[in-house]
């Protein structure tokens, strides 16, 4: 009897190990499979807490913004590159600083939208935009998480490095800004969200910021570093990232030289939530 029980126990353990091994080998191809004629609506919310010191005084700023954008894929090339017409639907922003609050809401955007070309990795290869967009409209800059465009096993990690240079709005004293990010991604596993079986990808990363500009005849130089942590869900049924959450902490210093020399340290904490729905 004891031998029989031991034999049964060995079989159970063997099946458990085999089952665990099979699950561990499960994989998915992580890339965007854009379809011509498909339309998606993106909602992005950002909560930003800023602490800035200047001339011995500390100033705290809290900003909340919500943007809604819509993108319609009008053309998909044989290699997978897709052209999308991106339209900003609405943006609302609320800022609190020095005991005062300011609200800004806008929904009367141009209907012709912005033409963007995305690769299967989610990278924007071409962007034809309107240079008259205001600073509040720049909040809705639509970007996708970059995917490795290959088969990834659950538990597997991969690295990604991005360098983005932005030409800032004319109202911003910083003329341009370059951001370098290094991220490590992990295919964490499967989860059920809103009745859908999704793949969860978690990530951590570091970033470096440099920029320069002019104001009132003085030169401005900006440097900063930060850390990010977050996750997003990939829906294999439509090959799109449909939800994400991220938190970032960034410390920057703006150095002013010219008629007056000073340094302005600033720390930021930003939480971003994104949802993408097919319409």
Set out the residue ranges of the language-model regions.
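Bacterial N-terminal signal peptides
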Residues: 10-19
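Signature of exported/secreted
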Residues: 24-279
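Bacterial N-terminal signal peptides that target proteins for export
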Residues: 1-11
């Amino acid at each position: 009897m004891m031998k029989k029980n031991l034999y049964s126990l060995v079989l159970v353990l063997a099946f458990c190990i085999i089952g665990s091994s099979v699950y561990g080998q499960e994989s998915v191809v992580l890339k965007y499979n854009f379809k011509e004629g498909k339309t998606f609506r993106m909602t992005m919310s950002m909560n930003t807490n800023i602490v800035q010191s200047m001339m011995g005084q500390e100033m705290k700023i809290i900003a909340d913004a919500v943007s809604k954008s819509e993108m319609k894929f009008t053309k998909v090339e044989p290699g997978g590159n897709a052209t999308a017409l991106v339209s900003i639907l609405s943006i609302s922003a609320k800022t609190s600083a020095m005991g005062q609050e300011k609200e800004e809401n806008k929904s009367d955007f141009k209907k012709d939208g912005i033409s963007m070309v995305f690769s299967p990795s989610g990278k924007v290869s071409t962007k034809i935009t309107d240079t008259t967009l205001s600073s509040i409209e720049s909040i809705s800059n639509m970007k996708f998480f970059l995917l490795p465009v290959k088969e990834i096993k659950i538990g597997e990690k991969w690295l990604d490095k991005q360098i983005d240079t932005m030409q800032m709005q004319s109202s911003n004293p910083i003329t341009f800004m370059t951001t370098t990010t290094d991220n490590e991604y992990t295919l964490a596993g499967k989860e059920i969200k809103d009745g859908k079986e999704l793949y969860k990808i978690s990530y951590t990363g570091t970033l470096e910021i440099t920029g320069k500009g002019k104001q009132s005849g003085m030169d401005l130089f900006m440097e900063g570093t930060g850390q990010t942590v977050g996750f997003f869900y990939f829906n294999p049924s439509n090959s799109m990232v449909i939800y994400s959450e991220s938190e970032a902490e960034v410390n920057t210093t703006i150095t002013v030289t010219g008629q007056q020399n000073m340094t302005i340290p600033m720390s930021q904490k930003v939480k971003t939530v994104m949802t993408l729905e097919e319409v």
